[in-house]
């Protein structure tokens, strides 16, 4: 425990907040252009080819973004919307692409959890 004299000389430091998605600059989403679309392999216990894109954002930052859902139509120079949210088994991937907005099409034939993949309500 610090003495009163010590606290007068140097007050207690409030813990600083560190963003999990700093490239968004406190915005909910950001627009960007795909510079490279490729697949990446996950960390040790898992095995897959995860679809990711390197995106240059409007604030000139380059980030790696995960493309969720089955199949996608993204290629180089596609304009995408990026939201925060990391992928646990892909190191360095701290952002997700928003499906169903700008150039990223929604997932076709998606029945459940449609809002997360930009899929329209099916005609029943």
UniProtKB/Swiss-Prot annotation:
HAMAP family the UniProt entry points to: Ribosomal_uS12_B
Function: With S4 and S5 plays an important role in translational accuracy. Interacts with and stabilizes bases of the 16S rRNA that are involved in tRNA selection in the A site and with the mRNA backbone. Located at the interface of the 30S and 50S subunits, it traverses the body of the 30S subunit contacting proteins on the other side and probably holding the rRNA structure together. The combined cluster of proteins S8, S12 and S17 appears to hold together the shoulder and platform of the 30S subunit.
Record-linked Pfam families: Ribosom_S12_S23
GO biological processes: translation
Family (UniProt): Belongs to the universal ribosomal protein uS12 family.
Modified residues (3-methylthioaspartic acid): 89
Record text on subunit structure and interactions: Part of the 30S ribosomal subunit. Contacts proteins S8 and S17. May interact with IF1 in the 30S initiation complex.
SUPFAM superfamilies to which the protein is assigned, alphabetical: Nucleic acid-binding proteins
Positions in coiled-coil regions: none
Gene Ontology annotations for the cellular component aspect, listed alphabetically: small ribosomal subunit
Region annotated Disordered, chain positions: 1-25
Protein name: Small ribosomal subunit protein uS12
Keyword Ribonucleoprotein part of the UniProt annotation: yes
Annotated organism of origin: Xylella fastidiosa (strain Temecula1 / ATCC 700964)
Gene Ontology molecular function: rRNA binding; structural constituent of ribosome; tRNA binding
Record key words, sorted: Methylation, Ribonucleoprotein, Ribosomal protein, RNA-binding, rRNA-binding, tRNA-binding
InterPro entries, per database record: NA-bd_OB-fold, Ribosomal_uS12, Ribosomal_uS12_bac
Keyword set includes Ribosomal protein: yes
CDD domains: Ribosomal_S12
């Amino acid at each position: 425990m610090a003495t009163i004299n010590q606290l007068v000389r140097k007050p207690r430091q409030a813990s600083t907040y560190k963003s999990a998605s700093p490239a968004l600059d406190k915005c909910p989403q950001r627009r960007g252009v795909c510079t490279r679309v490729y697949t990446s392999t996950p960390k040790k216990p898992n095995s897959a080819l995860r679809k990711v894109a390197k995106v240059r954002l409007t604030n000139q930052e380059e980030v790696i973004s995960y493309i969720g859902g089955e199949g996608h139509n993204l290629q180089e120079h596609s304009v995408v919307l990026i939201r925060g949210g990391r992928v646990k088994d892909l190191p360095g991937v701290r952002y997700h692409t928003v499906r169903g907005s700008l150039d990223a099409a929604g997932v076709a034939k998606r029945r459940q959890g449609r809002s997360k993949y930009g899929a329209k309500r099916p005609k029943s």
